[in-house]
């Protein structure tokens, strides 16, 4: 059986099917049939309808939103990421259910 080159002889659905599955050794006709069976499934139709252009446009970050995100990242300090504990702070040993009196000694023994 002669294999067709999908990028020239097949429909875009067949090319999409072969690209998604990695099965490039299919004939153009067989790939088109498989793609048709996938794309005609009600769940697939519903998903494709939900992913129309308007939905995709909403997913793209605008220039102002990008600038806002980058500003937040640039203004982040170490205190926003790490909580620094001092030896005078009250801490609780969760396993034992007791407050730690001497933090330096407790860290060495647990």
Swiss-Prot record:
Signal peptide as annotated in the record: none
Lineage: Viruses, Duplodnaviria, Heunggongvirae, Uroviricota, Caudoviricetes
GO terms for MF: DNA binding; nuclease activity
Domain of life (superkingdom): Viruses
Protein name per the record: Putative packaging signal terminase
UniProt keyword list: DNA-binding, Hydrolase, Nuclease, Viral genome packaging, Viral release from host cell
Keyword Metal-binding set for record: no
Function: This protein may possess the specific endonuclease activity required for cleavage at the pac site.
Residues annotated to bind DNA: 12-31, 27-46
